[in-house]
């Protein structure tokens, strides 16, 4: 019986995928025969799996290049596990990541677990709360795809209008949408455990260029679209808009032109996402 299905896709990161495979092989206190690993290959990564633990049920799917959400939906059709996770191609696990996740899920109280992300230098990859707690609709505890371990629901898939590669430039929010749908419509209980770690590179020294601005803009469109899709209250939306507006003013006053411009693109993207309608 499969307990956990891991869904991963990549276009051109064979070294990072190999690192993930190594971290998966190094998991302790688990039965590898209960792990399913589904990889949607949009490039040429087959050699990364030559040393994968043979007890793991490996599913390899060759695909043309596509959006992240579409690739995950391809894999979701093959899931056999009770739970599903979505490790990024450049993330990697601590040796006890999966066993600690199991310790929460096996209690039978929670349908899912989300954890904390750290980079190579053991610095948080986002603003994660210091204390563990139950996930709530208005407090997802900085949950992001690679930190999620969730009960599999056969009728739920990713919104392909959202995420990296979106045809509508809605470049983020697909995992938050998936998680919120589980909370709102499937009545799932999900626990955030600050002691469970998944590693992921952090863009601390990302270049301050047009690419960074476009990324901020696309992500902001995703944030705005997510707010409307899940009927977030007006005060929540206003707070969401005021922050980048203040950022524009503050960074302009302090003569930080790139940061001011990035705040502008975030505000612009969030407004566009809030008003976006599918044709």
Residue ranges and their predicted role:
Residues 163-167, 191-211, 223-226:
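Active-site donor/metal-binding and catalytic loop motifs
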Residues 164-180:
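Acidic donor-binding loop at a coil-to-helix junction in glycosyltransferase catalytic cores
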Residues 213-222, 228, 232-279:
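Non-catalytic, C-terminal membrane-associated alpha-helical segments of glycosyltransferases
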């Amino acid at each position: 019986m499969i307990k956990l299905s891991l869904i991963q896709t990549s276009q051109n990161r064979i070294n990072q995928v190999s690192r993930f495979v190594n971290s998966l092989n190094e998991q302790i206190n688990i039965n590898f025969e209960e792990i399913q690993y589904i990889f949607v290959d949009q490039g040429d990564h087959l050699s990364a799996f030559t040393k994968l633990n043979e007890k793991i049920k490996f599913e390899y799917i060759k695909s043309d290049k596509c959006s992240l959400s579409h690739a995950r939906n391809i894999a979701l059709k093959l899931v056999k596990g009770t739970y599903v996770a979505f490790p990024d191609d450049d993330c990697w696990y601590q040796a006890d990541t999966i066993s600690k996740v199991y310790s929460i899920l096996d209690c039978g109280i929670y349908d899912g677990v989300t954890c904390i992300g750290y980079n190579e230098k053991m610095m948080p990859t986002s603003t994660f709360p210091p204390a563990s707690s139950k996930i709530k609709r208005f407090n997802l505890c900085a949950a992001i795809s690679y930190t999620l371990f969730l009960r599999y629901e056969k009728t739920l898939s990713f919104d392909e209008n959202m995420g990296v590669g979106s045809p509508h430039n809605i470049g983020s929010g697909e995992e938050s949408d998936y998680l919120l749908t589980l909370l709102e419509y499937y009545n799932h209980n999900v626990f955030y455990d600050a002691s469970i770690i998944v590693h992921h590179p952090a863009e601390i020294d990302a270049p301050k260029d047009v690419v960074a601005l476009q990324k901020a803009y696309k992500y902001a469109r995703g944030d705005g679209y997510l707010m409307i899709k899940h009927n977030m209250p007006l005060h929540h939306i206003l707070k969401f808009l005021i922050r980048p507006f203040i950022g524009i003013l503050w960074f302009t006053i302090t003569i930080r032109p790139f940061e001011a411009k990035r705040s502008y693109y975030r505000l612009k993207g969030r407004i566009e996402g809030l008003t976006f309608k599918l044709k």
